[in-house]
Amino acid sequence: MFWRKSMKKSAWGLVDAFFDKYDLVDHHIHSYNDFVSNRIQEIIDTSEPIELEQGKYRVETGKVSIEKPFIKEADGSKSKIYPTEARLRNLTYSAHMSLEMRLLKEGGPETEFEKVYIGELPVMLKSEICHLHGLSRKELMEKGEDPADPGGYFIVNGSERSIVTMEEIAPNKIILERIGEEDENRARAIVTSIRSGFRARISLEYRKPRKTGVFLRISFPYVPGEIPLVILLRALGLATDQEIITSISDDFNYQMIAADDIQVSLDRLNLNKKEMKELDEEDRREYLIRSAIKYIGNRVAKGMTEDYRIKRAEDVIDRYLLPHIGTEPEKRLEKATYLAEMTEMLLQVISGERRPHDKDHYTNKRLRVSGDLMEDLLRVAFTSLSRDMSYQLERSLARGKEPSVKQAVRSDVLTENLKHAIATGNWVGGRAGVSQLLDRTSYMGTLSHMRRVVSPLSRSQPHFEARDLHPTQFGKICPNETPEGPNCGLVKNLALLAKISEGSDASEVEEVIKMGVVN
């Protein structure tokens, strides 16, 4: 009996220790802090540069600075604004963002950077740029706040809005699945490749052709329909039949499937065999690669000139095919190797050597919290600001005026983009309900809302397996708290002691691997 009491006391001691260190909404606040500290600057640094009159003028950007929330009164005076005041006056609790900019003229002197106000960023309560950050219980009460309030939400036009955690399939990871009826023996390998906010879904499918056709077909953004995999591998630099076959697998049966596809696809490339015989080995390689690129060009830019078709096909391959590997032409062979490995894995599923992935396994899922979703939103909003700025500068030049960066920036473009998305929940990429009105029915209801996890799957479809409780959710997702009705199993809640880990920088991981750390 004493032993049981002792164990119970120790268990609650551990729970207390956990909450002394972590808060229930830490995942939102830490993610937003990272977004403010690192990702905003990264978005600005990686955005397309603004160039005018074919490079005669160029806008250069520097460091971004964010001030803590303040308000300008009618008499022109500035004063700090706290969340309580924003709620009572139906205001948006937001921070002023300024960006260092300068306009460079070709052949002209280098000008100094000037600070330009670019818009307002909605501030998450209790984040690093919030006035409530680091305040004691007594100070919070003096500012009209509930000291037990967790924070982690926004105030837009006086309304409290919470960004819900979104559950998605893990990016940049090969997911193998069987499709269709069992007797069809069809399978698919999918990769959701993500780089700088751009999402490219690459789907490689194996299916038996009805008459004559290829077994392996691939689809990726900006290329209509499906194209034979072997043609894409050739376009990526695996010029000869032998290179394609050996890169896919050492297994003879898999090599035969690739050989059959090569034979069928050669007819589609319209090769001039007489011309090929006269070429030396290096020129023959170039000819085969160019023919494959031409085939893709006919899909992406039908009816255009040959040079444009080739240029457009190369651009699509570099930018939209597996962008997480890289967007430079030098990365094409790496992409070919990745696709070849993906093909072998797919063929192993077809032959029964490998089991398909369980899409509902939590290893194959990732949770996107406030910082990740705000990053997507700001990237699109900043692109809109850049386009508007480019238009304003072009107008100034057309009127014969000397362009000015300060006059070209319309701060309401960025502000309205961010405010509208958080106020309505309509996010970039056509997603709805990403931000919701914070549940204030009870304190427990508020905490529950802040720890909600939402699946993007359609509510009108059965999705029995996705709605089921999966063994890998143990300790991560609450097995009990899910609504009844169409949202059952698709709207979940984090377990009490669950903590969301943050993704690390890929370059740091590569450095560790180079040092010899395997696992």
Curated annotation (Swiss-Prot):
Subcellular location: Cytoplasm
Protein name: DNA-directed RNA polymerase subunit Rpo2N
Molecular function as annotated in GO: DNA binding; DNA-directed RNA polymerase activity; ribonucleoside binding
Catalytic reactions on record: RNA(n) + a ribonucleoside 5'-triphosphate = RNA(n+1) + diphosphate
UniProt-listed GO biological process terms: DNA-templated transcription
Subunit field text: Part of the RNA polymerase complex.
Entry's family note: Belongs to the RNA polymerase beta chain family.
One Pfam assignment: RNA_pol_Rpb2_3
Enzyme Commission code: 2.7.7.6
Gene from which this protein is expressed: rpo2N
Keyword list, A-Z: Cytoplasm, DNA-binding, DNA-directed RNA polymerase, Nucleotidyltransferase, Transcription, Transferase
Task of the protein: DNA-dependent RNA polymerase (RNAP) catalyzes the transcription of DNA into RNA using the four ribonucleoside triphosphates as substrates. The Rpo2 subunit (Rpo2N and Rpo2C in this organism) is implicated in DNA promoter recognition and in nucleotide binding.
Principal EC category: transferase
Lineage: Archaea, Methanobacteriati, Methanobacteriota, Methanomada group, Methanobacteria
Record organism: Methanothermobacter thermautotrophicus (strain ATCC 29096 / DSM 1053 / JCM 10044 / NBRC 100330 / Delta H) (Methanobacterium thermoautotrophicum)
GO cellular component: cytoplasm; DNA-directed RNA polymerase complex
InterPro entries: DNA-dir_RNA_pol_su2, RNA_pol_bsu_protrusion, RNA_pol_Rpb2_2, RNA_pol_Rpb2_2_sf, RNA_pol_Rpb2_3
Chief place where the protein resides: cytoplasm
